[in-house]
């Protein structure tokens, strides 16, 4: 997430995701860190379900929701996936609070989003961060840490 000092006001309302600059694209991230929590897929076909867990990437700062080494994350965590304008349609697993997903679905940003509130602390203040996260290196049984099963693959 970047500072929005050099960004056009309300750019997310006037530009499509494809029209955004790299700075605007990065500024959309609210810093909740939910995309850095592990997901578990069970079943196949129409019965395939996605489960969200409290298991975080080892680089995630559990208190702030920020990556501990953002610039090198792809070199350190081999399964870290870069969200881009081209692959966004493949990221149906993003949380329903994610700005990228919301804008892709034609929805508005929530009041607590830093671009709306003007505060980088609004995500934490709105209680959006996952509580009681645990790093992947400290987990033996993933099933103990499932927190949601709200998605069925299409």
From Swiss-Prot:
Q: Which InterPro entries match?
A: Puta_zinc/iron-chelating_dom, UCP006173
User: What are the disulphide bonds in this sequence?
Assistant: none
Family label: Belongs to the UPF0260 family.
Concerning HAMAP family, the annotation shows:
UPF0260 (MF_00676)
Q: What is this protein called?
A: UPF0260 protein HI_1355
